[in-house]
Structures are given as C-alpha cells and as structure tokens.
Amino acid sequence: MKPSIHSLTHQTMQEWVLEQGEKKFRADQIWEWLYRKRVQSFEEMTNLSKDLIAKLNDQFVVNPLKQGIVQESADGTVKYLFELPDGMLIETVLMCQHYGLSVCVTTQVGCNIGCTFCASGLIKKQRDLNNGEIVAQIMLVQKYFDERGQDERISHIVVMGIGEPFDNYNNVLNFFRTINDDKGMAIGARHITVSISGLAHKIRDFADEGVQVNLAVSLHAPNNELRSSIMKINRAFPIEKLFAAIEYYIETTNRRVTFEYIMLNEVNDGVEQALELAELLKNIKKSSYVNLIPYNPVSEHDQYSRSPKERVLAFYDTLKKKGGNCVVRQEHGTDIDAACGQLLFNTMKRDRQKAVAAVNP
C-alpha cells in the first residue's frame, strides 16, 4: 500500500527529491502543485520530467481517502465520512463561521480515552492516522470548494475530531508543519486549535516545541471525583498533574489556554460546580478561557441529557461574576449526526444491522 505524498513535510520532500538525484528546487515545484494548484494527479505537474513523475507514481498516491457519506446541515455545516486505504472509516466536519471556513479533523481511527458522554469512545481505537491521512482531510474539503469554482479557502482548523491528538503526537505535529507552511496552504498557526483530553507529559512537550498553535483542554469537571467519573483519563492524569502541566505551558509559551466544558444536565452544570471551576482557574484567570458547550445527545449514553438554557446561563453568570472569561459555544449541525463520532458510529451500527439481517433473513 503506497503512502500519500501528503505524508511528506516540506523538509522530507526536499530530502526525497535529492535521493532521487533531482535538484532541491523540484521539491518546491511539487509542493506548489499539491498545495497551491491542488492537482489530483502527478501527471498534472507539467513542469516535472516524465522520469520524476514516474518515480512519484511508483512510490506515492496523491489522495489516500475515498469520500463516502456527506451530510449537509441547514446552517451550512457539512459532515464527511472518508474511507482510508485499509477500509477503515473516519469523519471530518466543515463549519461555516462568521470569521471563515473551519474544518475539524480526525487524528485516529477510534478513541481509547473513553469519555462516558462521547460518541467517539464507542469506537475503540484501531490505529493512528499518519500525517498524510490528516492532511488529506483538509485537501478534500478544500476540493469541495475548488470544484464549484468558489473562491473560498479553508481559513481555520480545529483538531477536535475522533481520537486524542497527543496520543498521535508526531503525526499531528507534522500535520501542523505541512498545513502551516507558507509555500503551501499557509494556514496560520494561530488559526489552528488542537483539543486534548489531558496527557500532561505531552502538554509539557508541546510547550517546548515553540509551536504557535492554540491549545484547548477538555476539562468538563472542576474536581477529580466528578472528572474521573466522566473521563477515565483523569485517573492517570488527575487535575493537579494536569494543571501543573498547563501552568508550565502558559509560563513557557505566554499563550492562553481554552478549557472546554460540556454542559451535562444535573451532572456538572450546577452553580456549585461553577464556583469550583472559578476557584480552580483563579491563578490562571488572565490566561484562560472557558468554552461552555451544549451537549449533543448520544442514544448509547442516555444517562446524560442537555442542560436547560437556564442552568447554562446560571453557570455562565456565576463564572463571569468570579472574573472568569467564558462563552457559550455556538452550535453547528444539530440537524445531522453532529456529535463527534456520531456519523461514523451510526454508519457502523447500520452496517452491522445489515450484516445480521443478511445472515438471519
């Protein structure tokens, strides 16, 4: 199975070109064809020799993904199901924001973090995506606009799809390098956000990288007892260890951290939890921001329901009065399989049902 050419960073593409006995500038030409002109085959790279094109075809594919289901929401959100070369499935989401076009990418097939409210956790981790498979999600969504002759470009990326990005650390870092490269898609690092669940040692590593990508942490509870009950990762990385790493990140990078807090009715959305959260954040108040997220119900997690508006507003008001920076996140795609992992899980469930029906007609 040949890898995608998108698996190469600009640097490793230069190294590959030199290994083929070509001049280094050929890497820039290939890079421009891929990310500026966004061709779909090596044959379209008309300023390359036939010999180099043959080597590219022999060793790489351009696009490693096949497009499957596409769901479009009334609010402009588009959810894609892509098939990987080994037949496994992933999902990607396009969101039309007031500030531009934002794409949410997946980094793993399935997820082992096991958050008890999340559809992604219903799909056990099968493998990591390589850099090329993550980059290809962006390129295929951009193709959606290119083919329509629309002069629109993806401007923002959120790494919040299925999987824990820092459990696939090196591939995710190479994805950032590729998509941020100023000779390619040139999506600014500050327009990219990576959302993680709390691998504290990786937060420290990320701080030392000097990458300008925004960091978001899935917190969802203000104390260890509650967080451990809904996020099993907290048993390995309790809040004390997590916040020590976050404080190191803030001190090292001088950058703000966003905390994601999903609102689960009568679980974590009370005024008492808002007060606990304010206390937890008091030492990093000026360097933190809280995203209050309305819950998209998942039928397999029917122990949870969406917080009523009045409870969300009471939580928000309490946090604001204590000096917290927070916002209630705008919803997208509520009329489709909107929750992370929901489209993929529902597709897999339907496929299983069809298989059972075929065996037991």
UniProtKB/Swiss-Prot annotation:
It catalyses: adenosine(2503) in 23S rRNA + 2 reduced [2Fe-2S]-[ferredoxin] + 2 S-adenosyl-L-methionine = 2-methyladenosine(2503) in 23S rRNA + 5'-deoxyadenosine + L-methionine + 2 oxidized [2Fe-2S]-[ferredoxin] + S-adenosyl-L-homocysteine; adenosine(37) in tRNA + 2 reduced [2Fe-2S]-[ferredoxin] + 2 S-adenosyl-L-methionine = 2-methyladenosine(37) in tRNA + 5'-deoxyadenosine + L-methionine + 2 oxidized [2Fe-2S]-[ferredoxin] + S-adenosyl-L-homocysteine. Specifically methylates position 2 of adenine 2503 in 23S rRNA and position 2 of adenine 37 in tRNAs. Belongs to the radical SAM superfamily. RlmN family. Binds 1 [4Fe-4S] cluster. The cluster is coordinated with 3 cysteines and an exchangeable S-adenosyl-L-methionine. One of its GO terms (molecular function) is tRNA binding. It holds the Pfam family Radical_SAM. Its main location: cytoplasm. Residues 97-329 form the Radical SAM core domain. Disulfide bonds join C104-C340. It comes from the Bacteria. Reaction proceeds by a ping-pong mechanism involving intermediate methylation of a conserved cysteine residue. Its EC number is 2.1.1.192. It comes from Streptococcus pneumoniae (strain P1031). GO terms for cellular component: cytoplasm. CDD domains: Radical_SAM (cd01335). This is Probable dual-specificity RNA methyltransferase RlmN. The keyword Lipid metabolism does not apply. HAMAP family: RNA_methyltr_RlmN. One of its GO terms (biological process) is tRNA methylation. The active site is at E91, C340. PROSITE patterns: RADICAL_SAM. [4Fe-4S] cluster binds at C111, C115, C118. S-adenosyl-L-methionine binds at G163, E164, S195, S218, L219, H220, N296. Keywords: 4Fe-4S, Cytoplasm, Disulfide bond, Iron, Iron-sulfur, Metal-binding, Methyltransferase, rRNA processing, S-adenosyl-L-methionine, Transferase, tRNA processing. It is found in: Cytoplasm. Its cofactor is [4Fe-4S] cluster.
